[in-house]
Amino acid sequence: MKYRFLLAPAMLLTGCTLGDPGPKISPMAEIKVVNNNICLLAPVADGESMSALEIRTVEPEKNLRKHFTPPIFLSSTACTPLFGYRFQAGHNYGIFVNTERRNAQGKVVDARIIRASFRLGQDKNGKLQVITSTE
């Protein structure tokens, strides 16, 4: 009996997350430069939509975070909308896209975080190029 009283507070303090419906981390997205703009190709399935977007760099004032209601539908063959974010050569970036799929009743049945991490440079003509990409 004494051990039950010790076990209960220990379980409460550990923050047990059994059955946590949080999003899964998925494979890295592909980063390309198209018309001197960054293009993120997300490995999404049919019916998957973007509920949030975060673009991070070492300068906190240049970070971007957006939430979308209703979510924006994505395609694995089209660039993910980055809303005119101004990427600059010589900087490192991380992009995180929260995606979700809903059933016919509108309930979220699956959620993922798609991510990309990369450094930008410039070629001799001043065009952006991806120097490194973590995949």
Show which residues each predicted segment covers.
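Acidic, low-complexity Ser/Thr/Gly/Pro-rich repeat segments typical of extracellular/periplasmic
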Residues: 41-135
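C-terminal motif of bacterial Sec signal peptides marking the signal peptidase cleavage site
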Residues: 12-15
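Short, intrinsically disordered, charge-biased short linear motifs at domain edges
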Residues: 2, 25-27, 63-68
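Contiguous beta-strand segments within globular domains
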Residues: 24-47
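Secretory-pathway extracellular proteins and peptide precursors enriched for disulfide-bonded cysteines
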Residues: 8, 30-31, 69-72
